[in-house]
């Protein structure tokens, strides 16, 4: 769900005015449906385990309605079997083990290719060419960020409560890291909020000793992030525990300017879902694979 938010953003950014793109939660679709979904619709879903019950139920219903469904999942899993192996591509990574940027890459290639076929993203071939060797750059970014990841983990991994702020193309990754990695895998108490919503109540929760992470991207919403940064650095709250992570500081050389916004969630994933989470794990001594309830029994 949160991993596909950036794709919804990109398809709306680069698509034409007649293109309809919706990000729908499978559990909600199972009980509410969606009036704009027809047999002419194309659906992309994802399941790391291949068994997510809400997704499996939704996929089966969609197939019965004649809707075209593609999945990033194990072809041999229940969801893969429901979709059909020919419409599946195996997930290239899993949360907590690094490499989530590869999942972004696969989803982006799918969505941007659809746009290209509509005449909306003419630079698709250039995008593929310029990102084919991006994985070395991602490794370099990991190495460059590692000392800071170690420092941040030592300082904040044991905090009672932490706030995360993001926007635009980075909002999905902001949720993924704070909820899936820190809440689910580290059992940390977290608040995630968009840069535009931050000033509608959440700002009142800032006080000395509350760590605040601001993730800054390279899209139109950067102006909203800048407003948050100005507030955090003003000193008015007395809270000096703010962290600003700006994907522009880790820009990949040789990329067309139009592609920087596309790869910004990949970069943030490398920094947070991979390296920062791993360093939190070392400090908390809490294995990222520990679960009390998730996948432990039916609920």
Predicted feature descriptions by range:
Residues 1-39, 157-200:
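Anionic-ligand anchoring segments at beta-strand to alpha-helix junctions in alpha/beta enzyme folds, i.e.
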Residues 95-96, 112-195, 288-299:
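Active-site phosphate/pyrophosphate-binding segments
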Residues 228-299:
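Phosphate-moiety recognition in structured ligand-binding domains
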Residues 42-46, 161-168, 211-215:
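Short glycine-rich or small-residue beta-strand-to-loop segments that form or flank ligand, phosphate
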Residues 1-124, 130, 215-242:
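Glycine-rich phosphate-binding loops that contact phosphosugars or nucleotide phosphates
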Residues 23-25, 73-74, 189-197, 239-251:
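A generic structural motif
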Residues 172-242:
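Internal helical hairpin/lid segments
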Residues 76-88, 201-205, 250-260:
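Glycine-rich, charge-decorated loop segments at or immediately adjacent to ligand/cofactor-binding or catalytic sites
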């Amino acid at each position: 769900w949160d991993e596909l938010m950036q794709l919804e953003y990109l398809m709306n950014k680069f698509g034409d005015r007649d293109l309809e793109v919706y990000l729908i939660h499978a559990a909600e679709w199972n009980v509410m449906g969606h009036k704009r979904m027809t047999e002419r619709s194309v659906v992309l879903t994802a399941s790391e385990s291949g068994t997510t019950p809400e997704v499996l139920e939704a996929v089966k219903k969609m197939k019965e309605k004649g809707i075209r469904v593609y999945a990033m999942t194990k072809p041999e899993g229940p969801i893969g079997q429901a979709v059909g192996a020919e419409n599946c591509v195996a997930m290239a990574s899993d949360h907590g083990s690094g490499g989530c940027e590869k999942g972004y890459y696969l989803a982006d290639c799918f969505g941007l290719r659809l746009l290209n076929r509509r005449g909306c993203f003419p630079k698709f071939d250039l995008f593929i060419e310029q990102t084919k060797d991006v994985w070395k750059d991602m490794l370099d970014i990991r190495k460059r960020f590692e000392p800071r990841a170690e420092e941040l983990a030592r300082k904040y991994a044991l905090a009672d409560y932490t706030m995360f702020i993001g926007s635009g193309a980075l909002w999905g990754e902001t949720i993924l890291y704070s909820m899936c990695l820190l809440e689910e895998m580290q059992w940390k108490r977290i608040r995630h909020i968009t840069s535009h919503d931050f000033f509608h109540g959440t700002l009142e929760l800032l006080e000395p000793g509350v760590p605040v992470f601001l993730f800054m991207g390279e899209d139109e919403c950067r102006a909203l992030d800048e407003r948050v940064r100005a507030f955090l650095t003003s000193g008015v709250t007395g809270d000096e525990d703010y962290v600003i992570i700006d994907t522009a500081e880790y820009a990949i050389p040789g990329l067309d300017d139009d592609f920087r916004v596309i790869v910004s969630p990949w970069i943030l994933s490398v920094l947070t879902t991979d390296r920062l989470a791993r360093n939190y794990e070392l400090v908390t001594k809490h294995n990222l694979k520990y679960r009390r309830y998730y996948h432990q029994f039916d609920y």
